[in-house]
Protein backbone atom coordinates (compact mmCIF):
# COMPACT_ATOMS: atom_id res chain seq x y z
CA UNK A 1 0.00 0.00 0.00
CA UNK A 2 2.48 2.68 1.09
CA UNK A 3 4.59 2.19 -2.03
CA UNK A 4 1.59 3.11 -4.17
CA UNK A 5 0.95 6.48 -2.49
CA UNK A 6 2.91 9.17 -4.35
CA UNK A 7 3.03 11.52 -1.33
CA UNK A 8 4.83 8.88 0.76
CA UNK A 9 8.35 7.53 0.47
CA UNK A 10 9.34 4.43 2.42
CA UNK A 11 12.79 3.98 3.96
CA UNK A 12 14.02 0.70 5.42
CA UNK A 13 16.95 -0.21 7.62
CA UNK A 14 18.53 -3.64 7.49
CA UNK A 15 20.50 -5.56 10.08
CA UNK A 16 22.38 -8.59 8.77
CA UNK A 17 20.40 -8.30 5.53
CA UNK A 18 17.02 -8.44 7.25
CA UNK A 19 14.64 -5.48 7.25
CA UNK A 20 14.60 -4.37 10.88
CA UNK A 21 13.43 -0.76 10.71
CA UNK A 22 11.35 1.60 8.63
CA UNK A 23 10.26 5.22 8.37
CA UNK A 24 8.24 7.28 5.93
CA UNK A 25 8.65 10.75 4.46
CA UNK A 26 5.25 12.30 3.77
CA UNK A 27 4.78 15.33 1.53
CA UNK A 28 1.96 17.78 2.19
CA UNK A 29 -1.07 17.59 -0.10
CA UNK A 30 -0.61 19.51 -3.35
CA UNK A 31 -3.48 21.85 -2.50
CA UNK A 32 -1.74 23.02 0.71
CA UNK A 33 0.48 25.76 -0.69
CA UNK A 34 1.00 27.41 2.71
CA UNK A 35 2.73 24.28 4.02
CA UNK A 36 4.47 23.22 0.82
CA UNK A 37 7.82 23.94 2.52
CA UNK A 38 7.37 21.25 5.19
CA UNK A 39 7.28 17.46 5.20
CA UNK A 40 6.54 14.88 7.89
CA UNK A 41 8.65 12.02 9.19
CA UNK A 42 6.21 9.35 10.29
CA UNK A 43 5.82 5.69 11.23
CA UNK A 44 9.43 5.39 12.35
CA UNK A 45 10.00 1.98 13.92
CA UNK A 46 12.90 -0.28 14.84
CA UNK A 47 12.19 -3.92 15.71
CA UNK A 48 12.90 -4.66 19.38
CA UNK A 49 15.58 -7.23 18.48
CA UNK A 50 17.41 -4.66 16.33
CA UNK A 51 17.52 -1.74 18.74
CA UNK A 52 20.86 -0.32 19.86
CA UNK A 53 22.54 -0.58 16.45
CA UNK A 54 21.95 2.99 15.25
CA UNK A 55 19.18 2.18 12.79
CA UNK A 56 16.85 4.91 14.08
CA UNK A 57 19.52 7.57 13.64
CA UNK A 58 20.44 6.23 10.20
CA UNK A 59 16.81 6.29 9.05
CA UNK A 60 16.14 9.73 10.51
CA UNK A 61 19.19 11.19 8.75
CA UNK A 62 18.22 9.47 5.49
CA UNK A 63 14.71 10.95 5.67
CA UNK A 64 16.17 14.39 6.49
CA UNK A 65 18.52 14.21 3.50
CA UNK A 66 15.73 13.11 1.16
CA UNK A 67 13.48 15.91 2.42
CA UNK A 68 16.26 18.45 1.95
CA UNK A 69 17.01 17.16 -1.58
CA UNK A 70 13.30 17.40 -2.42
CA UNK A 71 13.38 21.09 -1.46
CA UNK A 72 11.66 20.94 1.92
CA UNK A 73 12.87 23.42 4.52
CA UNK A 74 11.12 21.95 7.58
CA UNK A 75 10.67 18.40 8.84
CA UNK A 76 7.99 17.67 11.44
CA UNK A 77 7.42 14.54 13.50
CA UNK A 78 5.48 13.32 16.50
CA UNK A 79 6.14 10.60 19.06
CA UNK A 80 4.57 9.14 22.18
CA UNK A 81 5.97 10.60 25.40
CA UNK A 82 6.88 7.07 26.50
CA UNK A 83 9.44 6.67 23.69
CA UNK A 84 12.42 8.00 25.64
CA UNK A 85 15.17 6.78 23.32
CA UNK A 86 13.45 8.31 20.28
CA UNK A 87 12.90 11.62 22.07
CA UNK A 88 16.56 11.71 23.10
CA UNK A 89 17.61 10.97 19.51
CA UNK A 90 15.44 13.74 18.08
CA UNK A 91 16.80 16.26 20.59
CA UNK A 92 20.38 15.21 19.74
CA UNK A 93 19.68 15.78 16.03
CA UNK A 94 18.42 19.32 16.61
CA UNK A 95 14.66 18.83 16.64
CA UNK A 96 12.71 21.33 18.74
CA UNK A 97 9.72 20.28 20.83
CA UNK A 98 6.86 22.66 20.08
CA UNK A 99 3.75 21.04 21.50
CA UNK A 100 2.14 18.25 23.46
CA UNK A 101 -1.15 16.46 22.83
CA UNK A 102 -2.38 15.01 26.15
CA UNK A 103 -4.62 12.38 24.50
CA UNK A 104 -2.37 11.41 21.57
CA UNK A 105 -2.79 7.63 21.91
CA UNK A 106 -4.52 4.98 24.00
CA UNK A 107 -2.31 2.18 25.23
CA UNK A 108 -3.60 -0.53 27.57
CA UNK A 109 -6.74 1.51 28.21
CA UNK A 110 -4.87 4.67 29.24
CA UNK A 111 -4.12 7.90 27.42
CA UNK A 112 -0.53 8.59 26.47
CA UNK A 113 0.60 12.09 25.54
CA UNK A 114 2.28 12.82 22.23
CA UNK A 115 5.13 15.23 21.65
CA UNK A 116 5.48 17.27 18.47
CA UNK A 117 8.89 18.20 17.07
CA UNK A 118 10.14 20.31 14.17
CA UNK A 119 13.52 20.93 12.55
CA UNK A 120 14.66 23.55 10.06
CA UNK A 121 16.55 21.70 7.33
CA UNK A 122 18.17 24.55 5.47
CA UNK A 123 21.61 25.67 6.60
CA UNK A 124 20.59 29.32 6.49
CA UNK A 125 17.95 28.64 9.14
CA UNK A 126 15.97 31.55 10.38
CA UNK A 127 17.04 32.73 13.85
CA UNK A 128 14.84 31.69 16.75
CA UNK A 129 12.53 34.35 18.10
CA UNK A 130 13.40 35.77 21.50
CA UNK A 131 10.93 37.15 23.97
How would you name each of these model-derived features?
Residues 60, 67-78:
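Conserved GNAT acetyl-CoA-binding A-motif
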Residues 54:
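Conserved G/P- and acidic residue-centered "switch" motifs that form tight phosphate/ATP-binding loops
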Amino acid sequence: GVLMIPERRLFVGRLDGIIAASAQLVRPPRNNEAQAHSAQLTTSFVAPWARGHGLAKMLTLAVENAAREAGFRVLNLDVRETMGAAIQLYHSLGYKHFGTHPHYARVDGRYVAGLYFSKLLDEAAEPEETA
